[in-house]
């Protein structure tokens, strides 16, 4: 009797299907990386600037400061759709000129440098002013940069963030629930916070709060129908900021003497265990966000030129971020605040210039 041939029920994928699955997995990792970056940068500015300087008014100033970034993201999505480009950089190439695509990449690099310097300053202040370690700020900045460079793997960092997304989310929800148990509606008064003049000044200085949203325009389109994009980190940021406002009276929120006090003051009302977890999570989040700035900045530098080995770019970018730390944290914070109101102006000009080119590109394709 002839034996039946061996049969397998394992599904055999083609090479193209396997490649598509890998690309989708890499895209999900990059999306998780951007979501963490967006949340950490927004909550850092929200606590250290909005809540510390205007108190209860931060509950409505936060969404207002996100609007310019959201508008530019919508404009970028429109240009991508008109040019049928997978990323905004490709939309610049198709709608205008490859040279302007390089200008857009250079603009993104400068934004990442500014944010990286801001995150590095936050980390240094957190250790030297908050935890009170007997280390000079410059050496603390050097140690922080070395730790961030150890995390800067081209594909390893996004995958690490993807693996940590649920533990970090659980931690954030735990802290949010703890803050909400201390919430009091009376702390919403006065809703104008420190006054209209302070609120107007804060809006003008924090109008670039949502600039990391522009990075989502560089994500290639996914296969899923329901793409939430930056919505989850923005919702979580607004919930955390609202919970901090409801847990702190305006008079107490505005007593922060330095950056570390402003970042750590909302943790005072947490339980001791949650306070420790919040401090650890805060440091991990800032370190990962700094590493993301370094990794993405290096990727843009390599994209502007020939694909040389990445380590010289990492070293050069680290030196670029470390050099301003010699000026002192207070002077550096003042310089960063002077630049912040103008961060979105070049991006808005470039996107407005792209719109007519994108419309012409669509007409050429439909003709």
Where are these regions (language model features)?
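Membrane-interface loop-to-helix entry segments
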Residues: 123, 137-140, 149-180, 340-352
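Membrane-interface interhelical connector segments
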Residues: 247-275
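Transmembrane helix-boundary motif of multi-pass solute transporters/channels
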Residues: 3-89, 217-221, 231, 255-263
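Membrane helical hairpin/interfacial module
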Residues: 44-138, 144
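Selective recognition of specific alpha-helical transmembrane segments in multi-pass small-molecule
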Residues: 64-77, 109-119, 144-150, 166-180, ...
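Hydrophobic, membrane-embedded alpha-helices of multi-pass small-molecule transporters
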Residues: 26-51, 64-68, 108-112, 140, ...
